[in-house]
Amino acid sequence: MADSKPATLSSVAASGFLAASERVKPHTKLIALLALGHFVIDANQGALPAVLPFLKQWHGLTYAQVAMLVLAGNLTSSLIQPLFGYLSDRIARRWVLPVSIVVSGVGVALLGLAPGYAASLALVVVMGLGVASWHPEGYKTASGVAGERKATALSLFSLGGNVGIAVGAPLVTFLVAGFGSQGTLGMLVPTAIVGTLMLAAMPMITRESIPRAGGRARVRGANMPGAMAVLILVVTVRAWATLGFSTFVPFYYVDTLKADPTIVGVLLFVFLGAGALGTVIAGPIADRVGPRPFIRWVLPMSLPFGVLFLLSHGPLAFVALACFGAVLTSSFSVSVLLAQAYLPRNAGMASGLIVGFAIGLGGAGVTALGWVADRWGVPTALWISALMPLVAFAVARFLPPPRDLAAA
C-alpha cells in the first residue's frame, strides 16, 4: 500500500488543484481567519437543529414539517453548492466570503421572530444560501494558502466549521432559554464581528491565495468523474447518518425519554464537538496513510458506537455519542481532499459537490427519516441512521486511486 502525498498538490483561484514547482509553507494567519469565518458560518447553520424543537412547540409543527425545514436548509445550503463552485472556478469572488457570513446570520437570527411555518421556511432558505455561497470559495481559498500538508491544513480549516456547528446549538439554546424567542437575534453578534474582520482582510486574501511556490504552477491531471460519483455516494450515506443523529437525537431525549428540552444543546455539542476533534486528528493521519484508505476504514469503525448509544443510558450514552460523532465525522475534510484529487481541474466544484451536493442528498434522507419517525417512532429512525456507516463502507470499497496520487 503506497502512501498518498497530498502535499504535492496546490491550488489557484481560477483553475483548481495545482502542482507547484516548490514546496510552500501554509499561510497560518489566513488559515486561522478562514477557520474563524468557517466557525461563524457553520455556527449559524448548526443553530438550526437546536431551534427545531422550539419551532415545533411555538408553531405546532409535525415531525414531517420539521424534517421539511431540515430538507429546505440542506437543499439551499448544500445541493446548490456545485453551482457556486462552478462560478468560483471561472471567476474568483472573494467578496462572497464576508457577504455570505452576514446572509447566513440574518437568516438564523430572525427565526425566533417568524410568525409561522412559512416564514420559518423562508428564513431557513436565506440562511442556507449564505452557507452555500461560502463553502466552495472558502475551501478553495484555504487550499490556495495551505502549503504542502494539505490534509492537515484543510482539517484545521474544517475544524472551524465543525466547532461552529457544535457551538451553534448550545449557543442558540442558551439565548432562547434566557431571552425567549427573540434570543435568536443574539446570533447577529458573532456574525457582525467576523464579517467585518473578513471584509478588512480581503486585500490580503486576494493577494495570498495565489501560487506562492516561487514560479508558475501548472494544472496537473485529468478529472475522474466516475470516481467522483462513487465518492459522492459515500459522502451522501455518511451525511445521512450524521444528519439523522443531529436531527433526531434531540427528539429522542425530549419526546421519547422525556428529558428537559434544554439538554438539546448539550447533546448536539457532545456529538458535533467530538466530530470537530475527530477532524483535527484525521488530518495528519490521512497525510501519512492517504485519503482513500483512511475513508475506507474509518467508516466501519464508527458503527459500534452508534449501536452502543442506542443500547445504553446515562454517562455511557454520552460517551458513545461522542465516539460515534468523532469517528464518523473524521473523514469530512479528507473527503474534500480526495474530491479535489479526483477533479484536479475544478477544485471549487469538487468542494461544492462534497460539502454541498452530497451532504444535501444526505439531508433528503432525513426527510425520509421524518416519515419513519412519524409512523414507527424516533428510535427506529435513529437505528437506521446508526447502521448507515456500514452501507457507506460497502460503497467506499469501490473508490479508485486518484491518477496523480500514489494512493493504495
How would you describe each model-predicted region?
Residues I80-A92, G278-G290, A373-D374:
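Helix-to-loop junctions at the C-terminal end of transmembrane segments
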Residues L123-G160:
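Cytoplasmic helix-loop-helix junction between adjacent transmembrane helices
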Residues F157-M204:
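Helix-loop-helix hairpin linking two adjacent transmembrane segments in secondary transporters
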Residues W95-L110, P293-V307, A386:
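Structural signature of the two symmetry-related core transmembrane helices
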Residues G46, N74-P82, I165-A166, L272-V280, ...:
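Residue-level signature of mid-helix packing/kink "hotspots" within the transmembrane helices
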Residues L48-P49, G226-L272, A276:
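Extracytoplasmic gate region of multi-pass secondary transporters
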